């Protein structure tokens, strides 16, 4: 199984890189880098988030979060907001301008993803999703050891 596992790893890695490179170009067209997009996307879908937890949720070092939040704040795409219950906690909140930008990005973003995945049938997409989820959860166990 080792040879087949290695081949699958290489195929997955190359597919991820190709998709990711293409999507990053799409994001750059809107004046964002992938990390900025990830932060805005998190806030857009999950609401206000403590700065301390954003890094964990998008897999970014805490020192980098401050830099990214500063950049997004300069672009007026998010604001910092003090916690009403804990003075030590600061939240990031997406602004109307940020929401508008993501509303502009998402339709094309989703269409690009659909186009790349269109080589698979609906059933294949479901099977692939389930299998990759199992592999990811299994890999996570090794990471947590």
From Swiss-Prot:
**InterPro entries (UniProt xref):** HTH_MarR-typ, Tscrpt_reg_MarR-type_CS, WH-like_DNA-bd_sf, WH_DNA-bd_sf
**GO MF entries:** DNA binding; DNA-binding transcription factor activity
Q: Give the record's keywords alphabetically.
A: DNA-binding, Repressor, Transcription, Transcription regulation
**GO biological-process terms attached to the record:** regulation of DNA-templated transcription; response to stress
- Residue ranges for the DNA-binding region feature of this UniProt entry: 51-74
Gene3D superfamilies noted in UniProt: Winged helix-like DNA-binding domain superfamily/Winged helix DNA-binding domain
PROSITE patterns according to UniProt: HTH_MARR_1, HTH_MARR_2
Span of the secretion signal? Answer: none
Q: What protein is this chain from?
A: HTH-type transcriptional regulator MhqR
């Amino acid at each position: 199984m080792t040879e087949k596992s290695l081949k699958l790893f290489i195929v997955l890695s190359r597919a991820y890189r190709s998709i990711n490179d293409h999507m990053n170009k799409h994001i750059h067209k809107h004046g964002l880098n992938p990390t900025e997009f990830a932060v805005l996307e998190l806030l857009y879908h999950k609401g206000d988030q403590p700065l301390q937890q954003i890094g964990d949720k998008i897999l970014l070092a805490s020192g980098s979060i401050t830099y990214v939040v500063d950049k997004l704040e300069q672009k007026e795409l998010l604001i910092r907001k003090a916690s009403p219950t804990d003075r030590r906690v600061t939240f990031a909140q997406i602004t109307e301008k940020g929401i508008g930008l993501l509303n502009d990005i998402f339709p094309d973003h989703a269409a690009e993803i659909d186009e790349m995945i269109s080589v698979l049938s609906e059933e294949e997409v479901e099977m692939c999703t389930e299998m990759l989820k199992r592999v990811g959860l299994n890999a996570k166990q090794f990471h947590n050891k």
